[in-house]
Amino acid sequence: MANPRIPYVLSSARAPLPPLDGKRILVHLVVNVENWQFDQPMPRTIVTPPHGRETVPDVPNFSWADYGMRAGLPRILKAFASRGLPASTSFNAGVIDAYPQAAKAMRDAGWEFIGHGMHQKAINHAEGGEEAVIAASLDKIAGFTGRRSRGWLSPGLRETVDTPDILVGKGIDYVCDWVVDDRPSWINTTSGYLMAMPYNLEINDSIIYAIERHATGEMARRLEFTLRRFEMECRDSAIVLAIGLHPHLISVPHRIHELERMLDLLTASADVGFFTGSQLADWYAAAEPAN
């Protein structure tokens, strides 16, 4: 079965996209800020339990994520603020209650809030049903920030067959789950079109460090090679370069310098600009309107 939502087309056969604010490599910094529930099994682990038996509470693996929310996030905030860079956060709405200082710090920094469920749990397993969880999380973010989220990233990028239709019905303009191209695409839904915003499964600290378990430095190495390629390819069309970040991974003491080095590498390129998800969505909708 072919992709039922996004018709197939070679990227090279698509019409060129114009620069945005004079830039051809459009960087989207996406910080995944998650609420791992203390009284539930952890969504991911770094410490294997003795005898292979999971326990709840899972203190070491909960603490892994909790450290990121306490000590890691301030490092990311400082790295972005010191360079004047805009960012988006894919945001579990439960963070508002669990980590109120963190939520306020991101709001005060002007980050864009992308819906990411209530807790770090796949929406197809959510209690109360997918639509209810999507609605509740978006409403909670709107109440906290004073504005509706325009973007969505499903926890674990996991959807059901109905997710795009539900998202459009809740007023979402773009979703980051469909990583099919280096430029946005249009997703067919029962109620019109939804934008597939490029995300990244290659330059993503969760993939590199939590799943593939590479040594520190691998993420910067991949970014360097990607930037070299995009500096060539962006002559033909503007390109979106998303970078997926997690406070408990990229901003531990032995990796935060890697993030800083990556940011400096990007800012040194004349082709690179930094944008939020909404800025990218407005740019693409104007350049290539949905039919």
Language model features with spans:
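A structural motif
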Residues: 189-207
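C-terminal amphipathic alpha-helical segment
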Residues: 202-204, 208-221
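Catalytic alpha-helical scaffold of carbohydrate-active enzymes acting on polysaccharides/glycoconjugates
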Residues: 2-195, 220-243, 249-291
